């Protein structure tokens, strides 16, 4: 019998190792979209993407956001970042949330305001100050409110074939291609623009509640103590100046 629920990830480049779920859970298919032809897994169905028409980070986001284009044969989907270990049957979460909502994600662990997150992105060097300011100024002109909410966006649970979700995901992808490439900065605005609010799930990669475990990115794992110390000092100085 064909499953109607798929857990999927996207891994382009060598940013992360592919982490197998703890087991192949009943009622779930597991798919990994990747450009790495030698990638192997005991659980993930490896689907090689040959047409790389965007920078690798945007290829990841393309598959992350536009699930209706690549997984239309499934009714429900859960996207997980490649550095998240699935520790329990995610179908239980789909049954818990997608019977009530079309789109659910973990709440951001630290902030609920895109404007605050934008400042943090600049401080951490994740976005350029001029581009980020331009994006936030545009949102202010549109009267997008502060503290509208924020998802962590590393887990996305969706009924991805509904017209509403297709419209939201299409808008989100277009916004990401015209503004900064931080998807957390654009999603809240897109939800607001579509007269939708955040629906949060209790389970997250940071507070797994038995379902998820967050694994450090390769880049973070490979940094020396002095590299980490230098980064922290740089951030402290930026906080004073910014």
Annotate each PLM feature.
Residues 81-85:
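The conserved acidic donor/metal-binding loop of glycosyltransferases
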Residues 5, 22, 97-98, 138:
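Catalytic phosphate/metal-binding cores of nucleic-acid and nucleotide-processing enzymes, i.e., regions
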Residues 234-242:
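Low-complexity, charge- and small-residue-enriched intrinsically disordered regions
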